[in-house]
A protein has these predicted regions:
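Soluble "head" domains of membrane/secretory-pathway proteins
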Residues: 2-44, 62, 66, 71-72, ...
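Alpha-helical transmembrane segments
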Residues: 46-53, 195
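Hydrophobic membrane-insertion alpha-helices, especially the h-region
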Residues: 50-66
Length: 262
């Protein structure tokens, strides 16, 4: 009789007689578990999406309030530098950390009486609410009808003159060559002579014959000059339409020979 080797597995009568079965999970319980996991993933995704959107809106509001704001160009007063429907970005660091300079393109709030009452466009309550919200946080260009864009010609104390049609502007006695003027535009059509008051600026459009600028408000308080406190910032780039994208550089050579006011 041969004895079984020690290393040969022996069958277990008890195990063979009573095999152990895997626990059976009901189908409805498994499905419920899957649905629970899916709901948890959906809630997590929704929460992360809301956090991202809120963070983006807060960041946009901070940027608009302290750094950059978008504006829409509605008129031809700055041709050919800016044309209708251009979207520009304006740096709110000037004035502020950075000074304004003669030749800068500036956006400023209407000092009073420069603009007609805005015409409301029919958008419906939802469209109006969406537009106002996006404008408030800086994701939509401001076209509220209370801002203007012009070129800064004179700073506080500057003596700005023009002898009439066909004559050049002078600032503190220095004549200006203005390459940014619209084709065919003259530096001025009528004579004027002004000294810019303290904390103010003298502004003119590049399309002089189609710009109701400082020249046309000389009979008002400030003599046509705009308070510097009204300045929103300096335009520095056209961002839309894409084929008109360009940086808006200061024409430094135009004002290079202008002396400080005496």
């Amino acid at each position: 009789m041969i004895e079984p080797a020690d290393d040969v597995a022996q069958p277990s009568p008890a195990a063979d007689a009573h095999p152990t079965a895997e626990p059976v999970v009901p189908r409805h319980a498994a499905a419920a578990g899957r649905r629970g996991k899916q709901r948890s993933a959906s809630v997590s995704f929704l929460r992360e999406t809301v956090i991202i959107l809120v963070s983006a809106l807060v960041l946009s509001l901070i940027v608009k309030t302290f750094l950059v704001q978008a504006f829409f160009i509605p008129s031809a007063s700055m041709h050919d530098t800016l044309i209708e429907n251009d979207r520009i970005l304006v740096s709110k660091l000037s004035p502020g950390p950075f000074d304004l300079h003669r030749g800068d393109i500036v956006v400023f709030k209407d000092p009073g009486g420069w603009l007609p009452a805005p015409v409301e466009t029919e958008r419906g309550p939802i469209g109006t609410a969406v537009r106002d919200t996006l404008t408030y946080v800086g994701l939509y260009p401001d076209d509220a009808g209370e801002h203007l864009v012009k070129r800064l010609i004179g700073l506080p104390g500057d003596h700005v003159t023009c002898a009439g049609a066909g004559k050049k502007l002078t600032v503190n006695g220095a004549p200006l060559d203005e390459p940014y003027l619209a084709p065919g535009a003259q530096p001025c059509e009528t004579a004027f002579d002004t000294v810019v008051p303290p904390e103010s600026m003298w502004v003119m459009g590049d399309n002089r014959q189609h710009s109701a600028d400082s020249r046309f408000h000389q009979g008002e308080p400030g003599g046509g000059s705009v308070p510097l406190k009204n300045v929103v910032g300096k335009a520095f780039v056209i961002v839309w339409p894409a084929d008109h994208w360009q940086l808006l550089r200061n024409p430094g050579a135009t004002f290079a020979d202008v002396p400080d006011p005496s």
